Amino acid sequence: MKRELKPDFYYKYYIYASGVKSAVESFRFVLDAEIEEEKLHYAVGRLLQRLPWLSLKPYITKEGRLNAYADAVGKPVYRDDGSRCFLGSKDTQGYLFYVSFKEHEIWLRIGHSLSDGRGMMLICQLLLYYYLEARYGSIDDEGLLNAALKPD
């Protein structure tokens, strides 16, 4: 059952799926080693558990109102093939963000409606933390994150 969540303001989420220009932030991370897809899927799964608001997916009600529902089904992780993905569409399974990878690079693309710049930095930190933890084992988190934001 969908749990409806009304947006705090009338932000027009539909622009993400319509293909028009919108506020999408891109972050690129270059690592020394080849990216392991299953570890990246794990990291995004942990990210969705830790920050459940990332799973908000917009939809239009029968009455024409914009609402959102929380649905963490699937993970928006894709091998980068050069094609364009539209946030909030079937391309991203309805998510307003996605993660792509290619060789030694990870790209995080996130709609500005989900977070401001400070929140996006937290998302970046946690994504990298969970990926590196899955890839290399336990990581000493001292000095990585604010004490109030320690990983699970």
Identify the meaning behind each predicted range.
Residues M1-D152:
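Non-catalytic N-terminal regions of enzymes
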